[in-house]
Design a protein with these regions (language model features):
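Short, intrinsically disordered, low-complexity terminal segments
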Residues: 11, 15-18, 33, 47-50
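Short, charged early-sequence alpha-helical segments and their helix-coil boundaries
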Residues: 41-72
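Amphipathic alpha-helical segments that form the core helices of the histone-fold
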Residues: 32-42
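Short terminal alpha-helical segments
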Residues: 1-28, 70-73, 77
């Protein structure tokens, strides 16, 4: 798996987690669901989307899985 493919999969995972979080409001959920669909279905991807995913995940309660995901995204973004 290439670095880009790995980052893309982490972004999709981060967006999915952010959508399901209780702290994410309705408008954010709709936006994040749309972005996740675009990334996964149409292979639309950019570093800005990865940074946005990291931003939303950073706002969530820190569980072990969230901490690992944040670290992975930060490492892959450089």
């Amino acid at each position: 798996m290439t670095r880009e493919e790995l980052l893309k999969s982490k972004v999709i995972k981060a967006l999915s987690i952010a959508v399901s979080a209780k702290s994410t409001n309705g408008y954010e959920k709709m936006f994040l669901e749309q972005v996740a669909t675009e990334v996964s279905k149409y292979d639309v991807y950019s570093v800005n989307i990865a940074e946005a995913a990291l931003f939303y995940v950073s706002r969530l309660e820190e569980t072990p899985a969230i901490i690992v995901l944040k670290r992975d995204l930060e490492d892959l973004l450089g």
